[in-house]
Amino acid sequence: YGGRVAAKSACEQADVVDLSCATQIDFPPTSQISEIKQLNKVMQETMGVVRNENTLLNGIQTVQALTGNLPLLGMAVLKSALARKESRGAHWREDYPKSNDNDYLKTTVARFDGKQIQISFVPVPERR
């Protein structure tokens, strides 16, 4: 409800005459809601504070059965966590408890080529 009120207020106060705003929220079809709940559960179970290869692989296996953009994003997060074989900040792997600056002091990049997600690591630019 609050979102609709905010959207309506934003539309009323818009200073661009031709700006069209949607004041109705389109919720996903009921058939997708169960998949979204399943994705939510899997991500909470596998991407919590403590992670390891087995839980991440189980999460990947479950998410592979789901369709849509949200599961695709979840898959990118899971594969990124699996590829980073170290612990750093909020990413803590019990099977790799130490950080590894040599291999992973980098930004994780996930790319989707239309068929699969590719994970790579790009060096972090030096700070001046």
Predicted regions and their residues:
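Glycine- and aromatic-enriched mobile tails/lids
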Residues: Y1-R128
